[in-house]
């Protein structure tokens, strides 16, 4: 695999480097590094054309024409995943970051990771890289526009080319043909870039060509290196490939030896036949036979020379195979020693894997406990909401009870007022009744007096008429009858000597006396009329007082009825609220008991978690020690198997083996880090949940105490509203302070454990960075 992490390495698995090899078809010598001859405008146009081609695949939603956004490799990874999903798998795609950052180190790491996978795919499709364009990509990534644009254009060219030469090449070739009809100029530029990259990635020779190793030494070396490259995917696989090569070489040597022996036997046979022919020539003197024998002799000599040349070539091949066998034997010994170290490291990794399985089990337990904690948290939240509702209702009931007390006092005052008004109403009714009776008596007397007055007036009218009549008669008589002097004198002396006149005067006098008496009676009735008028005025005043008292009585009765209705409603509402409040208080007590039990379970779980955490901390320390030892062994192996100069024996296979094992260990460490982060986050979340639950339980406990005191308040002395409010406001803070003092050691222990976990994570990050550091040459 091409090593992009080591800038000082001058060789790769396929023999390509800054120096040209004989396999490139060029002379051996130093070559200049790749230089981009295109301008920035041309590169931007090329990237835009390739972006149009890749966007037509609908493989990604990320932008493909911005070089800075392409540096994280996610967009190219999604396109490659569409090119060959069997090689560029979903698991590998998930390892490519999706975040956008401007960190140059992240850019370089993502570019190296993407190119390593692309280079593996190039080997997978039996091709090799022969241009220095691809060996210094990391050198052109430094986070500025003028340098990351060429690198992203080159990677885009490689992605488009791999689509046209990969396993699913037919589909993408058809897609390009269909796209040519609408984007001719763009596809022409893309075709040029694909042709350039295909020339720089020729196909590899097959392994069966090793039978033609009678060629030059450089061809043998290149073939051996390419075979090592094609079969270098692990220490066990490389060792099996080396053993297979050694067996094939030994078989080839045996075959060559057998062929050499057969050729020697053929030479001896031909020599004997030549001697026999010479002996026959001495006995046979015919010229025709001699010429034939000479021709045969010449042919035999020519064949002998060819066989001798071939024998020399086979001897050279045997010597060459001896050197190869010696190198493979040494490499096999190194591989065996490395295999022992690998087995030892494998044992350590197996132990780490078992620890990882245990961690996974613990993580699953933590996850289950976290789910239970979430459920408990939901229940606690529901209980808190119910508690708040009950508390609000309790406050409402307290306020309503206070209002009811005030209403009761008002009702008592109103009842007192109603009693006074009722008594006053009774007195007024009694006085009214007495006055009514007086008025009735006065009315009766008035009626009687009115009747008498009417009778008297009638009698008076009759008498007046009678008097007037009599006066008229008297006047008439006087006018008709003349009087004598004697009568005049008699009248003057009030003497009457005539009996007739005495008879007429006597009734008149009697009537006159009667009238005089009647007049006197009437005059005596004048005070009664004044009294009657006075009684009438008093009667009017009493009537007005009666109406006012009746109206006031009706208003008081209406107020009494309203107050009685309000009193009944308040009594019914208060009785219903008291019953509901008692039920809710009982429910709250049951829920408080459940929460106390949940707190006990949580404390038990906390103790268990602390014990498990202590055990896992000790195991983490052991694993960290084992990882330090593994790192030391890896560093020692890398130091012992580092590449040396070209003119002495190298140990590239051992270096590749250590590098791959380092990669595996790095992946293991990353997995362990992920597991550690998951466990740490779960532990932190549990700590937060437990802390919040403990604080909430302290508050609930104080609320329960207040509610219990209120529930038992009926058996104690009655308290005023001000005392109740002071007590409900003072007790929760006192209990909260005491509970806070009790929970403070647990919080400090949680903080210490969290700090220790952060230190473990920091140590794993340092180990990972040390494992990923490039080896020194």
Swiss-Prot record:
Q: What induces it?
A: Induced by DNA-damage.
- The primary location reported for this protein is nucleus
What outcome is documented for mutating residue 44 to P in this protein? In ct350; temperature-sensitive allele. Induces aberrant centrosome attachment and nuclear positioning when transferred to nonpermissive temperature
A Pfam family assignment: HOOK_N
- Write out the tissue specificity statement of the associated record: Expressed in the syncytial gonad, oocytes, and in all cells during the development of the early embryo.
**InterPro entries from the UniProt entry:** CH_dom (IPR001715), CH_dom_sf (IPR036872), HOOK_N (IPR043936)
Question: Where found, per UniProt?
Answer: Nucleus membrane; Cytoplasm, Cytoskeleton, Microtubule organizing center, Centrosome; Cytoplasm, Cytoskeleton
Residues annotated as transmembrane = 747-767
Q: Where is this region: Disordered?
A: 1-36, 217-242, 273-292
Stretch list, region Interaction with dli-1 = 1-234
Q: Which GO terms describe its cellular component?
A: centrosome; cytoplasm; microtubule; nuclear envelope; nuclear membrane
Stretches the record annotates as Interaction with unc-84: 749-777
Alphabetic keyword roster: Coiled coil, Cytoplasm, Cytoskeleton, Membrane, Microtubule, Nucleus, Transmembrane, Transmembrane helix
Identify the residues that the record assigns to the Calponin-homology (CH) domain, covering every copy: 44-169
Among Gene3D superfamilies, the record links this protein to: Calponin-like domain
A biological process (GO) of this protein is:
embryo development ending in birth or egg hatching
In a knockout, what does one observe?
RNAi-mediated knockdown results in a reduced number of viable progeny following incubation with the DNA cross-linking agent cisplatin.
Give me the stretches of Low complexity compositional bias. 218-235
Start-end of Polar residues biased regions: 273-288
The similarity comment for this entry is: Belongs to the hook family.
Q: Its quaternary structure? A: Homodimer. Interacts with the dynein subunit dli-1 via its N-terminus. May interact with microtubules. Interacts with sut-2. Interacts (via C-terminus) with unc-84 (via C-terminus); the interaction is direct.
- Protein name in the entry: Zygote defective protein 12
- Its source organism is Caenorhabditis elegans
What gene is this protein translated from?
zyg-12
